[in-house]
A protein has these predicted regions:
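Conserved strand-to-helix beginnings and helix N-cap segments that scaffold or border functional pockets
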Residues: 88-93, 121-125
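Canonical Radical SAM [4Fe-4S] cluster-binding loop centered on the CxxxCxxC motif
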Residues: 3, 13-53
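Core AdoMet radical
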Residues: 38-54, 67-87, 105-120, 129, ...
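Short coil-to-beta-strand
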Residues: 32-33, 63, 71
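Surface-exposed amphipathic alpha-helices with a cationic face
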Residues: 92-105
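Short, basic/hydrophobic alpha-helical segments
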Residues: 59-67
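Well-ordered, non-membrane alpha-helical segments in soluble/globular domains
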Residues: 55-56, 60, 90-95
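Class I S-adenosyl-L-methionine
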Residues: 1-24, 151-172
Length: 172
């Protein structure tokens, strides 16, 4: 399977407490797009860096192993674009499954999506998030930007987004 990724990097911005390995998937299926989206370069599918899925998983395993030499636990953060877009969701499922099986409680799989929990259920996408530990759901809304009195962006980035932590899979 081929997967298109815009970028992969270590980040302290994409998770509220843990060092994250952020995977920005290419392509966003939201219409209209989020006003003032800071990832416009991820909108178009099938651009940027093309990976064989197994090669991408190995790259991520190597990065996780390296990070776990210094940290007890890290986040693997799935962003975009849109990780649950039809052309990304199978890869997101396979990556999250393999990483969770290998690293178990040493990683926290965290997925960002413009979709709400209701939309995930309505679109029958629950299976794709089976190995996620946390979700940040809802479109970015710049008019509801979540900042402190000094202007620092808080988590999540807009007040309409929901941060959900759970220990077991969502049931249908």
């Amino acid at each position: 399977m081929t997967v298109y990724v815009n970028r992969i990097f270590f980040s302290t911005n994409d998770h509220p407490k843990l060092l994250g390995i952020s995977i920005y998937f290419q392509g966003c299926d939201r219409s209209p797009k989020c006003l003032l989206c800071h990832n416009k370069e991820t909108w178009e599918p099938y651009r940027r860096f093309k990976y064989d899925l197994e090669d991408l998983i190995q790259i991520l395993k190597d990065k996780i192993t390296y990070a776990l030499e210094s940290y007890d636990k890290i986040a693997v953060v799935y962003l975009g674009g849109e990780p649950l877009a039809p052309y990304n969701r199978d890869a997101v499922f396979q990556i999250s499954k393999e990483l969770k099986e290998e690293f178990s409680e040493k990683i926290v799989n965290t997925l960002y999506s413009w979709r709400t929990l209701e939309e995930i259920e309505k679109q029958n996408l629950e299976n794709y998030i089976e190995y996620m530990d946390e979700l940040v759901l809802g479109p970015y809304d710049h008019t509801q930007r979540n900042v402190d009195e000094k202007g620092n962006v808080l988590f999540p980035a807009s007040k309409n987004q929901k941060y959900i932590k759970f220990n077991k899979v969502l049931s249908k």
